[in-house]
């Protein structure tokens, strides 16, 4: 009888614990100081939420018909992604849909960006194996940015899959990024100061 009560308690508490964990993770991000938000601070918070390296987070701003990297800084000068291209970030911006790829090496993408040395990581056998991509929307529903979280490793099994829950979390984070961009003077302006 005592075991039944524990089981019922677990069934009731389990979704509540999962919700509390999700809220803590989102609060980590929402706790950023809005006036001081920069692409670097936002992407560092996102990396922390998803337990990835900061160089595994990308933030691109839509400017006209091009997506330009705001973060990582090393990719700012590497070029832009045309909105009309088949790149994942471009598709995310066009469709306004979040996507998850646990087989990213099989997806057609702009691998040129993977050749740019990021931070002190150097060029090694670490390639993007897994990727999530989500649109960042303005209050009017227009795409203003795209945020991506990846996992790099020498082979797919070493990277660990993203889950549908991770993608939901990224969509929530993208909403917060949109609010940061709307409430502040904009992330791009903060990064150029």
Positions of predicted regions on the chain:
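Regulatory loop-to-helix N-cap segments in sensory/regulatory domains
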Residues: 2-10, 143, 151-173, 180-189
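Regulatory sensory and allosteric helical modules in signal-transduction proteins
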Residues: 68, 76-114, 121-124, 132
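Helix-loop-beta substructure at the N-terminus of cytosolic sensory domains
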Residues: 28-70, 184
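Signal-transmission linkers at sensory-effector interfaces
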Residues: 1-37, 176, 183-193
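A short, aliphatic-rich beta-strand micro-motif
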Residues: 129-138, 145
């Amino acid at each position: 009888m005592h075991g039944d009560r524990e089981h019922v308690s677990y069934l009731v508490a389990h979704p509540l614990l999962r919700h509390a964990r999700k809220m803590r993770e989102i609060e980590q991000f929402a706790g950023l100081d809005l006036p001081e938000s920069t692409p670097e601070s936002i992407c560092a918070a996102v990396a922390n939420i998803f337990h990835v390296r900061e160089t595994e987070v990308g933030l691109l701003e839509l400017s006209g018909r091009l997506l330009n990297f705001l973060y990582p800084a090393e990719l700012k000068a590497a070029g832009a992604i045309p909105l009309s291209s088949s790149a994942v970030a471009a598709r995310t911006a066009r469709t306004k849909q979040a996507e998850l790829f646990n087989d990213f090496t099989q997806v057609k993408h702009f691998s040129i960006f993977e050749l740019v040395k990021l931070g002190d990581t150097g060029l090694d056998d670490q390639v993007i194996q897994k990727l999530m991509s989500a649109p960042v929307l303005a209050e009017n529903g227009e795409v203003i940015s795209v945020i991506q979280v990846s996992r790099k490793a020498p082979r797919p099994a070493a990277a660990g899959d993203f889950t549908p829950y991770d993608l939901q979390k990224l969509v929530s984070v993208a909403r917060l990024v949109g609010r940061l961009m709307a409430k502040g003077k904009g992330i791009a302006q903060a990064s150029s100061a």
